[in-house]
A protein has these predicted regions:
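Chalcogenol-based redox active-site neighborhoods
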Residues: 1-154
Length: 154
């Protein structure tokens, strides 16, 4: 598998959201999409990142931008997370890690000297035609929303 680059066609996928409905990236043709991958529901960094997207969602929607969050958690976990923090955008369950691997964000990580596999916090901005407009890799949860908002104000 090759790493994705700016200008590449974003790989399409079909994943279930918190309500069990199938969501495809191709459903959003004609809109820009912020596709953000995060490690785990209801953990401190992931909660900050999700709440920052929530708090800026109106501004993003005015710019014809959809936000989709993806983690390896299941639909039930996403439902609890979304309800707890009033997250108005879709969280998608990549429990089999297929999409995370395809986007090259599921990889070997190291925390406190312990190695494990998981999602590296990353975001793909996808244009109206399904092409990758920008890639943010290994982002800082607290500050990432500023990068995203700046991307759409160019």
């Amino acid at each position: 598998m090759i790493n994705l680059k700016i200008g590449d066609k974003a790989p399409d996928f079909a994943l279930k959201d918190a309500e069990g409905k199938t969501v495809k990236l191709s459903d959003f043709k004609g809109k820009k999409v912020v596709l953000y991958f995060y490690p785990k529901d209801d953990t401190s960094g992931c909660t900050k990142e999700a709440c920052n997207f929530r708090d800026n969602l109106d501004a993003l929607k005015k710019l014809n931008v959809e936000v989709l969050g993806v983690s390896n958690d299941d639909e039930a976990s996403h439902k609890k997370f979304a309800e707890k923090y009033s997250l108005p955008f879709r969280l998608l369950a990549d429990a089999d890690k297929k999409v995370s691997r395809e986007y090259r964000v599921y990889e070997l990580k190291n925390m406190y000297g312990k190695e494990y596999y998981g999602i590296t916090r990353s975001t793909f901005v996808i244009d109206e035609n399904g092409k990758i407009q920008q890639i943010y890799y290994k982002v800082k949860a607290e500050e990432h929303i500023n990068e995203i908002m700046a991307e759409f104000k160019k």
